[in-house]
Amino acid sequence: CWFIQRIGKKFASKDDVVDSRKILNKWKFLVPIAPIAGQTDFSKPIGFYYDGNTIVAKPGECSTESWLVAGTFDTEKEVKNFKSYLFTKISRFLLLQAVISQHVTRKNFMFVPDLGRYDKKITDDYLIKKFEISKSDWEYIDSRITKIKDE
């Protein structure tokens, strides 16, 4: 079971795990519920999610409420492609539009569309074409969200 970032992964008895959504045996992408803790100057670019604060959880792994299950999938490829989507500047910018505190919940993803299929890596270039984002809109998004290694 994945606990808070500082503790990491520890054993949890199956008797202590409630799987009401039937996702325990799926691949899961876990994101922290407080990804921007400590950032108070929102005039500077925001990062949100990156390799150091997210987890690809394997089937059979669970998490505490310190983590939000951002997506569940049947294959490792799908979860990694979904991760690439959430790591785009566009999806992180859309998430920022609904965030009013350091605490992120499922509701904050209201402007981040579910692409439905994650059979390939998702990039900002792909999303710019898909959503017909103008050059000026992209320049604004690019200025507000920090670049991360996986982009």
Cite the ranges covered by each PLM segment:
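Polybasic, glycine- and aromatic-enriched phosphate-binding surface used to engage nucleic acids
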Residues: 1-122, 126-132, 137, 143-151
